[in-house]
Structure formats: structure tokens, C-alpha cells
């Protein structure tokens, strides 16, 4: 048997003894999980042998991979090959984090490093954007949005709100997913949210647009970042300098709501409804 589970009745260790050290996991893997790992091992090859594309199709048009997107992929390649299992990527808003990660997930699958992927977000609008991007960029990979009340499906890519996964993560074994992507991860590594993330024994990739100096240490600790430094960072000043973003200008003003207030017609406030309507 290529895998060993060790337990003292409280902790469970998973040991892929031919490739890695034993590590703590939250639950035993299923037979299907282990069969998938054996299959992936037979297909595995170095990420360096999987070319990073110069161009890709997005919404029917050919786009050129930007230098910093290529740099992020190369940084991930190096850390994956070194055996690191958690990664933090910092890219400013508007610099194509979703495109980058979808293209990188494709390379992980091609290298035999992943078959099942979980893409977590914390807002409905972000989930909508993620599933649209994944289905556009990865049309050959089955995917779906796991919403409350929807039965779990056996597809390659699962997009889900973290708020939903908190109540459903125990439906999955710890070995069910090979990669867990968390968008805007600096907001999502506290309390029960971190419990849901930590349940999965997977490669964890955190995405954030927040500059490193404003990220709390909890995020760096979760993603095993050395010296509180992301695995790859592209500062917004560089994006301005290189012409990938337009410099912003501050505009000040006072809205009628701020100056005059508002009358509340109903006492009931539904945060979920507010989220759907305004985000």
C-alpha cells in the first residue's frame, strides 16, 4: 500500500511515505480519494515540463498573458516543487487574478498534481464571476456552483461560498479536493471559516488584492509565509508604472443619505438579501 494512516484515537496522520512526510489530517480519506491519488501519481510530471501559455482565449478573444501573471505561475511552480502546500498571491484588483488562477489550475491538472478543485469566495457576485471565468477558460473541465440546498455533484471544479461550505464541509472527506483556492483570503481565515478551510488536505492557494503591509499575521501564518511575505506579490505601484492599471484620483463628496439620513420602512434586515441586491 502506498499510503499509511496513523492514529492515536485523537489525531490522524496521513503518510504518503514514498513522496512526503506524515502530516495531520482531519479525517480518513475514502477509497475513491486514495485511488485518485494513485492515478495522479502515475500521471505526475514536473510543472516545469508543462508550458506556460503566452496567449489564451477569454470570452472569444485572444489575450496575452501578462509578465506578472507569468511570474506568479513561475513562483508557484518553484514552491510546489519544493514541497510547500500553502501559497499566498497578492495582485491588485483589475490585474486578472481569476484568469491567472484558472490557467494555473489547468497546468496543475496537466502535471498530474490535481484532479478535484474547490474555489471558495465570500460573496455571491464573486462566485458568479468565478464560475463564469472557469467555464470560459476551462471548458473541458466539469464545474458547478454548490449553493445551499443543492445536492453535491461529482465534478472537477466546485465553486462555493465559504459561508455555505462552513455548514457542509463535513459532507466531504479531507482528501476529496486536491486544490483549494480562496479568493480575498485575508477576510476568511478566522474562526469557523478557517475550520472549513483547514478541513481539506489540499494545496491551498490564497488570493488577495490587499497589500502585504495591511494583511494581518493570521493570513501569513495560515499560508505558511516566511517573514510575513506573500509567495508572489505585484505592487499596485508597479501596475501603474507598467501601464496595466490607470492611476486613481481621490474624489470627495457628501451623499444625501449621509447629509440628511434615511427613513427605515421595515424593522427586519436580511443581510443575505442586501448582499444579493447591492453586490
Briefly describe each language-model feature range.
Residues 1-116, 125, 129-140, 154-157, ...:
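ATP-dependent helicase/translocase motor core
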Residues 121-125, 144-152, 161-167:
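Conserved helicase motor
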Residues 172-206, 211:
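SF2 helicase catalytic motif II
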Residues 217-279:
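Interdomain helical connector at the RecA1-RecA2 junction of SF1/SF2 helicase-like NTPases
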Amino acid at each position: 500500500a502506498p499510503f499509511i494512516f496513523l492514529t492515536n484515537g485523537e489525531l490522524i496522520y496521513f503518510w504518503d511515505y514514498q513522496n512526503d512526510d506524515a502530516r495531520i489530517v482531519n479525517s480518513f480519506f475514502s477509497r475513491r480519494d486514495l485511488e485518485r491519488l494513485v492515478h495522479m501519481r502515475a500521471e505526475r510530471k514536473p510543472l516545469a515540463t508543462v508550458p506556460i501559455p503566452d496567449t489564451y482565449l477569454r470570452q472569444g478573444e485572444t489575450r496575452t498573458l501578462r509578465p506578472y501573471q507569468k511570474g506568479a505561475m513561475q513562483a508557484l511552480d518553484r514552491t510546489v516543487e519544493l514541497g510547500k502546500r500553502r501559497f499566498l498571491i497578492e495582485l491588485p484588483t483589475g490585474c486578472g487574478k481569476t484568469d491567472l488562477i484558472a490557467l494555473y489550475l489547468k497546468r496543475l491538472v496537466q502535471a498530474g498534481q490535481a484532479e478535484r478543485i474547490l474555489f471558495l469566495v465570500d460573496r455571491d457576485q464573486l462566485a458568479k464571476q468565478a464560475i463564469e471565468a472557469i467555464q470560459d477558460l476551462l471548458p473541458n473541465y466539469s464545474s458547478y456552483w454548490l449553493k445551499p440546498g443543492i445536492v453535491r455533484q461529482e465534478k472537477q471544479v466546485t465553486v462555493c461560498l465559504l459561508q455555505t461550505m462552513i455548514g457542509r464541509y463535513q459532507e466531504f472527506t479531507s482528501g476529496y479536493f486536491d486544490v483549494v483556492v480562496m479568493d480575498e483570503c485575508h477576510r476568511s481565515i478566522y474562526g469557523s471559516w478557517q475550520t472549513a478551510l483547514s478541513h481539506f488536505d489540499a494545496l491551498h492557494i490564497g488570493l488577495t488584492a490587499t497589500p502585504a503591509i495591511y494583511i494581518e499575521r493570521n493570513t501569513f501564518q495560515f499560508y505558511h509565509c516566511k517573514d510575513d511575505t506573500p509567495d508572489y506579490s505585484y505592487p499596485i505601484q508597479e501596475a501603474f508604472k507598467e501601464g496595466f492599471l490607470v492611476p486613481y484620483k481621490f474624489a470627495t463628496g457628501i451623499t444625501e443619505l449621509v447629509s440628511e439620513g434615511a427613513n427605515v420602512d421595515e424593522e427586519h434586515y436580511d443581510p443575505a438579501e442586501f448582499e444579493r441586491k447591492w453586490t
